Amino acid sequence: VGLESPPKLAVILSQVKFLSRFYIDGFILGIIIAGVLGSVFPVSGTAESILNWATKIAIGFLFLLYGARLSPQEAWKGVKHWRLHTVVLAATFVLFPLIGLALRFLSPTLISDELYTGILYMCLVPSTVQSSIAFTSIAKGNVAGAIVSASFSNLIGVFVTPLLVVLLMNTTGQATVDFSSILDIVVQLLIPFIVGQLIRPLVIGWLQKYAEPIKYVDRGSILLVVFAAFSESMKEGIWSTITIWQIVILTIVCCLILALVLGVTTLAGRKLGFDLPDQIVIIFCGSKKSLATGLPMAAVLFAGQPVGLIVLPLMIFHQIQLIVCAAMAQRFANRDPVSVS
């Protein structure tokens, strides 16, 4: 999930088989538990100050790891197949944002301003790496193309997503990203990411050797961000403003967004003359949104705002995309080669 080096194919396949059987993402369960704990046991005073600093350090370390893991050579290797990657990037950073802007009418009539901000933010984050590659593999698509597209999306997403937030959310009045926020983006996100890229040749062997324990440090940092966000939301009384009806509407909206993007990417792949393996890349890489990148980035971009509510649409969308895409991947895998056009 998120900014990470492409996993080995055997690991990918085992994870997809698990997903396709149970349709439950263990990472999502951990995030839900962290959110519940933050809501039930909100911190304050000295503990809150310590938590805030720990969260900032965790986010910086997280993006340092992201930079060290992501191979720029891998991302640039597929430039020769630029048409494929252009379509995927257009789906991620053009189609999704346009859909998010078009849904402005939902607020405040059907959902709160904070939830709409979350929907728009969800539409601005980059694609995933691991699940995009995993589903492409199980669907018998162009795995090499998926690796390049997903990696490139994450590589530029670290820079493009904050830029889109500044441009789109400030102009629509959905969030305030001032100079202080931009400075936080540079200090907590961009500098650690660039440092990670620079030290990658020195540490990549160590990261690969200890990939399994580092994964838990990686995810633990994200869980800390979620706990802090929900703790702050509970302390500010934000959750009392949300109704079950709004959650239902939010879930329906996330389903409709995914359905629309899947429809457009499917049609685009066919109409633009891509073969089926490349169409699969466009469908799975172009429809994903990264939880691992989006959550910590939101904590920086929306500091002082109800982050717990803002990331809620991304959390819901992430689980929906896993369920739907796992089913689609199995359907592609079981297709009749003779009947495929």
Language model: regions and residue ranges:
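Structural signature of multi-pass alpha-helical membrane transport proteins
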Residues: 3-107, 166, 170-274, 336, ...
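Helix-loop junctions at the membrane interface of multi-pass solute transporters
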Residues: 77, 130-142, 267-271, 297-303, ...
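Extracellular/periplasmic helix-loop-helix junctions in multi-pass membrane proteins
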Residues: 237-244, 297-315
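Membrane-helix cytosolic exit motif
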Residues: 261-269, 297, 311-337
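C-terminal hydrophobic structural anchor segments
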Residues: 264-297, 339
